[in-house]
């Protein structure tokens, strides 16, 4: 069983770095394509300020020169979902669960264990980077599928931009999750609810060592409970009354 989570734009490097590992050929090809951009070209590519673009340029060049600082991916990313994941004071069993079951899907690194070393970078599958004439999704599809082809159960906490990198055959094995709030009988869903709930849900999976869909249905976390009436066999819905 594998659990897939996305990367995040927000990052935190305020903790000790760890040793890097060599880039996969697919990752090196992406980096080579990114490294062709000047700082001013990155400004329009990323749709960010000149200051941000200059920072990203330095990050890319540091990776290219193999001088970039690397950090465990789970701690490097610091978006809303990540801030709601239990990342410290893990028991040995929780650490093992993380290492064996939780994987990050990255447009630069591929599908990798959640504690893998990553350097600060900015890239997602909505960005129009061409790698040897291919889109990022086309470039990564075979490698993404290869990582999961032997898995029977895949829990996806990904957005559609990441899920659609995988083939239909792999996506058919995915169990997806939706998190909603019940406000006086009105069911609401929005980005902030979803991101926080994904982090809390992953924490519950880790703490309860969940291995099956049945075990996931029984979870009660951060006020969310499973709603069978709203769910499908491979699309579970959790609702929080507020």
UniProtKB/Swiss-Prot annotation:
Family: Belongs to the UPF0246 family.
Organism: Streptococcus pneumoniae serotype 4 (strain ATCC BAA-334 / TIGR4)
Domain of life of the native organism: Bacteria
Coiled-coil parts of chain: none
One GO term describing the cellular component: cytosol
Taxonomy of the source species: Bacteria, Bacillati, Bacillota, Bacilli, Lactobacillales
PANTHER family reported for this sequence: PEROXIDE STRESS RESISTANCE PROTEIN YAAA, PEROXIDE STRESS RESPONSE PROTEIN YAAA
Biological process, per Gene Ontology: response to hydroperoxide
Stated name of the protein: UPF0246 protein SP_1547
